[in-house]
Amino acid sequence: MRNILFVCTGNTCRSPMAQGICEKLAFDQRLPIMAKSAGLSATTGAPVSANAVAACRELGVDISRYRATDVRELDLSAFDAIYTMSVHHKAALIALGANPYKVSVLGTENGGIPDPYGGDIDTYRRCRDEIYNAIESSLKEL
């Protein structure tokens, strides 16, 4: 079983969408993967953005029960791979002690995944699609 962590800022938009999408793709492809998400500035227990929930639901992914987790509450060494949404997140995780060889920026060809926070549903759909495509490519490498 491979443990994967997705990290963004507040753990209410990008990283929970990534977790849900990864879980669905892993299930559909029968891959032994466990996904988790967290945020560098998360308020533990905060709900996921309604637009993130709606955008994922359109793909048959239910993230409505996910709650925000601060990354400092996790043992980063327990993860086989850590995907961040920006180069800034990557640098912050390495500063917190994450193994730099395990940390990658999701959607690197675009410099990461843009934050949809505060955007409309179409903004979240574009973000979801970028995350989906990036994870689909990344799973081939695991």
Regions found by a protein language model. Name each.
Residues 1-77, 140-142:
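Conserved active-site segments centered on acidic
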Residues 75, 86-87:
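Helix N-cap/beta->alpha junction signal
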Residues 81, 87-142:
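Phosphate-binding/catalytic loops
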